[in-house]
Every structure is written in C-alpha cells, then in structure tokens.
A protein has these predicted regions:
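N-terminal capping/lid subdomain adjacent to the active-site entrance of alpha/beta enzymes
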Residues: 1-80, 85-94, 98-102, 224-228
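Short, small-residue-enriched loops and turns at beta-alpha junctions
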Residues: 56-62, 84-92, 109-117, 137-140, ...
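Residues at structural and domain junctions
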Residues: 22, 37, 53-56, 109, ...
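Shared catalytic-loop signature of beta/alpha-barrel
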Residues: 98, 104, 115-228
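Generic enzyme active-site microenvironment
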Residues: 52, 81-82, 107-108, 132-134, ...
Length: 228
C-alpha cells in the first residue's frame, strides 16, 4: 500500500520541463527508505498482513535498496508485493525480475505492457516467484488470452487482478470467473483491482483471494470500513 507525496508525483511525472524539481527519490535515498518503512509500519499496525510498493521510477539499484528496506521491517507473517505499473520494456523487465527474485515477494505486478503476452511469458520463464497482472484487461477475451499465452500458472501462485468497474461491472466479471474456471484457475488467486467497495464486495461475494485497499488515498474511497 505505497503512495507518493505531491512532490514525488511531480518528480516521477517528468522533470524535463521542470529542471528545478528535485526528486526525493534521487537526492535523499536514505530519507525515502525511512519514509517508506514508516508508511508500511502504519499499514501493518492497522491490521494489514500484505503491503505493496511501486518500482520503476528510479534506477534499479535504488529500487533494490527500497525493496530491501521494506522487507527488513516486515514481520514473519506479512508479505510484500511490488508493482511496476507496466513500465518496463524487455531489458528492464528481465533485469528487475532477476533483482527481485531473491526477495521472495508475494508477487511482482505488471512488469510489462499488459497486452505483451509474449514478453510476460518470457519473464515468467526466468522469474522465480509469482507474477500478477490483469487490471488493464477490460474484456473476458483479453483475460482468456492472458491465461492462454501469458505464461502464468496457478501452480506458481500467479495472480489475476481484473478491475471490475473498468471491465464492465459485476455481471461481466462473473462471466470472466466462469471462463477462468474452465481454465482451472482457482478463485483464491483472483484479487480484484481498484481499492473500492465494488471490488471488496466482489471478493467477499465470490470467495476470491482478496482485494486491494488504498488507506489514506482517494478521499472517501480510501480504505474500507472498520468492520470489513
């Protein structure tokens, strides 16, 4: 459950036209790691047993330090996922896969273009850990092509993260579930993307693996009710 400050958002959006903007990622790596650790501790203290952080806005070596910093403060029962937001081309994706493998992440999310199933399959062939993707696939046919050609396997505990509100709602999500059942994809490996009440209701109602939450982000859509 990683989030960016306003300054970090501006810095990662691009500094070509804003040469005076200094990214805290680049100039204060230790401060960034400490801030990230503090944020993750807050989520753990709130009861979360899995947290997620972003990578890809910095050089690989600095991202490795950030991942190591977060892993170092997680208790034995907690897990970490890492999200690249579809940023990488082939060379970067493979390099990050090799760097992240020793960390034993719960999953490495969206390492490449969501429709580049050939590259995703190549990453799956060399990455020793679960992958996740699917939030940018908006049709049942796209998700079926993902499981056919993307190299993902239930035996690896790979995760599919379709975003129901963006993928034609609950009725179409139910049809996607039927398709995945035909491919023998277990429901505990489905985590609806979105961090919203629809995704939470779908995860609970269909008996899925879980749903994302964005505590402290997106105003009234942040997090979930205390009884959830």
């Amino acid at each position: 459950a990683d989030s960016l400050t306003e300054e970090e958002t501006r810095a990662n959006r691009g500094t070509v036209t804003e040469p005076g903007v200094a990214s805290p990622f680049r100039n204060r790596p230790m401060e960034e790691s400490l801030r990230l650790q503090d944020e993750m501790r807050r989520h753990l203290d709130a009861g979360y047993t899995m947290v997620k952080m972003k990578v890809g806005g910095l050089p690989l070596a600095e991202d490795a330090q950030r991942v190591e910093a977060v892993k170092s403060i997680l208790p034995s029962h907690a897990e970490l996922a890492v999200d690249a937001n579809c940023k990488f081309g082939r060379d970067e994706a493979l390099a990050y896969a090799k760097m992240l493998a020793p960390f034993k992440l719960r999953w490495f999310e969206e390492p490449c273009d969501p429709l580049d199933f050939a590259l995703l399959a190549e990453i799956a062939s060399i990455y020793d850990g679960p992958l996740s993707t699917g939030e940018d696939l908006f049709s049942t046919a796209d998700v079926e092509n993902l499981v056919r050609f993307g190299g993902l396997k239930p035996a690896r505990r790979d995760v599919i993260q379709v975003d129901p509100p963006q993928a034609y709602g609950i009725a179409q999500y139910a049809r996607t579930l039927d398709m995945l059942a035909r491919h023998q994809w277990p429901r505990d490996l489905l985590f609806p993307h979105g961090g919203n009440q629809m995704s939470l209701a779908i995860a609970a109602g269909f008996g899925l693996g879980g749903a994302e939450s964005y505590p402290g982000v997106f105003g009234p859509f942040a997090g979930f009710a205390e009884e959830a």
